[in-house]
């Protein structure tokens, strides 16, 4: 009998949620997703020190004379994300998601400019924009930035998405893909209710993604739905049939080992017949987020967490740059 992973792959595009190149080689997914936390974890791995050094060297060459260490580190954050993305694309056949600095989540123009820069960095390596998804937090400003980018042919993945309002606003803006965070929705409900277990289809994260998926298919939206941030295998199984699921290596390994029949839960034909075409203007969007305590708290927490990961990455890069400089000085003497 085929493994659960093999069966899942026949009905859903399985995506690797990692920046670890060895894990991607092992599972051979079509696509891969990264975020600041995953890039930071990979950057801490001694196996990738040469990649970090190449990123620093590339940044030095890209900057004009007289640059400061602050300039260098900011440039290298972009470079290192693209260097990891480049290596990932050597392994997979599909797309890699590279995230815009989370600290720009409430600045539309800065997000657009950063996305264009990332695409240009990939272009310098001979990688076409069709293989890149630019990850942007699903704030109002982020969605507006993505709408601009999509019109330029830059495909986007709207992340940190926690409710129906965010999802529909992305779809109406003709965004390529959204990443609703299943597990983080579950985390919030566990913390608030004191309930330790939500089984199968009762999982609030599963309920949210199912609602979004069915509405999108009924209304004919082209925006792809990629479930993300899983806490257990049941969440993954309950979303079998979703357009894409991005899954951490530890769960990919468990799915690979497990046998048994996997039942498809989501299908284009399973619709819920909404009579309303939802559309959220800015004031409606902000009010909806304000009224949804879970979504507003988790969006804020996610942006804060990714921002801290970037700051830690900057510290790591600065430390490595200092080590390289000191080594060169010692060698020169």
From Swiss-Prot:
Pathway entry: Carbohydrate degradation; pentose phosphate pathway; D-glyceraldehyde 3-phosphate and beta-D-fructose 6-phosphate from D-ribose 5-phosphate and D-xylulose 5-phosphate (non-oxidative stage): step 2/3
Location(s), subcellular: Cytoplasm
Main location: cytoplasm
Organism: Prochlorococcus marinus (strain MIT 9301)
Function: Transaldolase is important for the balance of metabolites in the pentose-phosphate pathway.
Top-level class of the enzyme under EC nomenclature: transferase
Protein name, per record: Transaldolase
Entry similarity comment: Belongs to the transaldolase family. Type 1 subfamily.
Record lineage: Bacteria, Bacillati, Cyanobacteriota, Cyanophyceae, Synechococcales
Gene3D superfamilies, A to Z: Aldolase class I (3.20.20.70)
Active site: 135 (schiff-base intermediate with substrate)
Assembly and binders: Homodimer.
Leader sequence residues: none
